[in-house]
Amino acid sequence: KDYNVVLKYIRQEVDMNETFRCAVTDLVTTPVLTVNGWWFDGNPVAEIPEEVVICGLQEASVKYPDLFAKHYNHYAPVAHRDGLVALNTAFAQDGVFVYVPDDVVLERPLQIINLLRAKADLMGFQRNLIVLGKNARATVLVCDHTLSEHDFLINNTTEVYLGPNAHMEYYQVQNQHLRASQINSLFVSEHRNSTFESVAISI
């Protein structure tokens, strides 16, 4: 099957209130959007602690080069051990970057809403990097949705780093139509006394 691959950002008009409606009522989160694997440049300014960074992966590589280089592609397996991750590393241009520094608690869950919308069959690659410092805490809810009826083949990789005594809850909810196929690779590097809890649900 032939798929289109998007290797540059194509801006799409997205009204979060109209395009995406969460089925979970009374859910209070800090929401951010990606569209076809790219950070949505219309994301609202999040109400988060000043020290916390939530932005696109491409933006993080420019604004925070030292932090980015210290963690990016350090926890996923090397290419000869996992061809799908190697494919993601080669083609992924963007995604979500989260940094919670030492002793900081992200009070609201971060909701990453990954939307797929295209006018033709699409293959997408998204790379996410989440870094929690010492004693940091965060909850991340990832919601995957399709907005158009074309075929989608998605290859996503997420790397997570937890410093000493850090705690993270990670939830992934996949709510996509039957013509969407998704490969999610999640790799976690944990330090002493850290805790990582993960739940994945496909609807």
Where are these regions (language model features)?
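Conserved beta-strand/loop scaffold segments within soluble protein domains that form the structured core
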Residues: 27, 31-36, 40-203
